């Protein structure tokens, strides 16, 4: 016998309450509670992911199955997934509206259709609209099926009929299950539809991609458990006024996290950027003050990026500090060290810092480049265009070691840099390539004296 239970659920964070609340005690959102009646079947349970019947087995007796990853024609996309698409995996892709999530998945789908059957389910566009959008992407294989539907029961039926190898859901907020009360995109609908898709993906070995909307704070909309249910969480990000897009993995059960893939939006769709370091530095001005280059690591990939700074006397009572692509607290810490340990009077100076090209820099190794960029703008002295900077800055002004120092130096040498300032205690036992000088430093003051003297 079915039991009905009425619950009020916050549509912003998924907090549940037995009664209506004007303000959510969890996320402080106003007027976000919606009543949802969930019908629970007492006797029947969800089918096990292993099949109709599942029994405990010893770990040593489990067959060691080596999954064959399916490669797309985009090496950047394969890199983020950990080497390709794993059969039966559930992949969630989020991003701002208009950033190119549907375009990315449509391109990936056309490539996967050459290696298996693809079912593309859209709840936001008709089949004719998707066909019109796909014409600029090139030829499409016959094993590419379009299905404009929002009913989960109908989608399940077509999955059982077509038996696809790859399934794309665009988007999860538009799909609804008739067994669950609540409107499309509600917390209960998103949770139950995702659970059903997970069961279909695991039992039928279907690699499933799910598009998810994001909130105004930039996080994935819907219940937080959505990210826990899936195997991989990808964020597709970038400035809407820039052509570059970054695909970032924040969770991956089948590969490394913090890997990124870089794409450029063009008239024919997304084009992968195979040498992002050269792209990010090609517009750098020689002789400009307030600029420094750092070799940052994005997963296993070294990328050269430019840190820009503009330091100018303030006209306000309190100096302004603005950052784009850099952590505000990290910049404030570095400016305090420069003022205390290096004698730079920055308390009456406005400071504006950004990472050129729209890439986000958040690892400790960027500290030294940020400090040099600030000092360059403050002193009105440019850095050499062939110099790069590596190192974390401590509160006493010391330069601390960073990871993968040899890989970073090799990347700088590959792009023609002739000098790299790096932590002295991190240079022992590494092979330095020819044509580049590595200067071991111990304090920020030592670096500023060497660069600007």
Curated annotation (Swiss-Prot):
Transmembrane segments: none annotated. A zinc finger (C4-type) spans 10-27. GO terms for molecular function: ATP binding; ATP hydrolysis activity; ATP-dependent DNA damage sensor activity; damaged DNA binding; zinc ion binding. HAMAP family: RadA_bact. NCBIfam families: sms (TIGR00416). This is DNA repair protein RadA. Pfam families: AAA_25 (PF13481), ChlI (PF13541), Zn_ribbon_LapB (PF18073). A motif (RadA KNRFG motif) lies at residues 251-255. PROSITE patterns: RECA_2. DNA-dependent ATPase involved in processing of recombination intermediates, plays a role in repairing DNA breaks. Stimulates the branch migration of RecA-mediated strand transfer reactions, allowing the 3' invading strand to extend heteroduplex DNA faster. Binds ssDNA in the presence of ADP but not other nucleotides, has ATPase activity that is stimulated by ssDNA and various branched DNA structures, but inhibited by SSB. Does not have RecA's homology-searching function. The keyword Ligase does not apply. Its EC number is 3.6.4.-. Has a putative N-terminal zinc-finger, a middle region with homology to RecA with ATPase motifs including the RadA KNRFG motif, while the C-terminus is homologous to Lon protease. Belongs to the RecA family. RadA subfamily. Keywords: ATP-binding, DNA damage, DNA repair, DNA-binding, Hydrolase, Metal-binding, Nucleotide-binding, Stress response, Zinc, Zinc-finger. Residues 350-453 are annotated as: Lon-protease-like. It comes from the Bacteria. SUPFAM superfamilies: P-loop containing nucleoside triphosphate hydrolases (SSF52540), Ribosomal protein S5 domain 2-like (SSF54211). One of its GO terms (cellular component) is cytosol. ATP binds at residues 95-102. Signal peptide: none annotated. GO terms for biological process: recombinational repair.
């Amino acid at each position: 016998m079915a039991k009905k239970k009425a619950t009020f659920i916050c549509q912003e964070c998924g907090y549940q309450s037995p009664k209506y609340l004007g303000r959510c005690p969890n996320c402080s959102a106003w007027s976000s509670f919606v009543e949802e009646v969930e019908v629970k079947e007492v006797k029947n349970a969800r089918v096990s992911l292993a099949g109709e019947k599942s029994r405990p087995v010893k770990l040593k007796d489990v067959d060691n199955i080596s999954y064959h990853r399916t490669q797309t024609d985009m090496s950047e996309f394969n890199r983020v997934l950990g080497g390709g698409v794993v059969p039966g995996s559930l992949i969630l892709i989020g991003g701002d509206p208009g950033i190119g999530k549907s375009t990315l998945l449509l391109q990936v789908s056309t490539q996967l259709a050459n290696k298996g059957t693809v079912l593309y389910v859209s709840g936001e566009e008709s089949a004719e609209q998707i066909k019109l959008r796909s014409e600029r992407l090139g030829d499409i294989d016959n094993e590419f099926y379009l299905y404009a539907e929002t009913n989960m029961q109908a989608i399940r039926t077509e999955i059982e009929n077509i038996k696809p190898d790859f399934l794309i859901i665009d988007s999860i907020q538009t799909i609804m299950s008739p067994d669950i009360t609540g409107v499309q995109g509600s917390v209960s609908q998103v949770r139950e539809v995702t659970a059903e898709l997970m069961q279909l993906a695991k039992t039928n070995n279907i690699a499933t991609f799910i598009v998810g909307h994001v909130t105004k704070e930039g996080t994935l909309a819907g219940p937080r458990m959505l990210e826990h249910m899936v195997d991989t969480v990808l964020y597709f990000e970038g400035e809407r006024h820039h052509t570059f897009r970054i695909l970032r993995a924040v969770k991956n059960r089948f590969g490394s996290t913090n890997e990124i893939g870089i794409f450029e939006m063009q008239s024919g769709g997304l084009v992968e950027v195979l040498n992002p370091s050269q792209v990010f530095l090609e517009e750098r001005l020689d002789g400009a003050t307030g600029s420094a280059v750092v070799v940052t690591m994005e997963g296993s990939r070294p990328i050269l990026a430019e840190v820009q700074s503009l330091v100018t006397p303030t006209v306000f009572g309190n100096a302004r500090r603005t950052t784009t692509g850099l952590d505000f607290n990290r910049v404030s810490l570095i400016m305090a060290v420069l003022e205390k340990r290096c004698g730079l009077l920055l308390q009456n100076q406005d400071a504006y810092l950004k990472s050129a090209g729209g890439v986000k820099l958040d690892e400790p190794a960027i500290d030294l480049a940020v400090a040099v960029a600030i000092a360059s703008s403050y002193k009105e002295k440019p850095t050499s265009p062939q110099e790069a900077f590596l190192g974390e800055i401590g509160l006493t002004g010391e330069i601390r070691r960073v990871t993968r120092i040899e890989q970073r130096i090799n990347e700088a040498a590959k792009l023609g840099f002739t000098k790299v300032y790096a932590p002295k205690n991190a240079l022992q036992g590494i092979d330095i390539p020819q044509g580049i000088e590595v200067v071991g430093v111990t304090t920020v003051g030592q670096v500023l004296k060497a660069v600007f003297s």
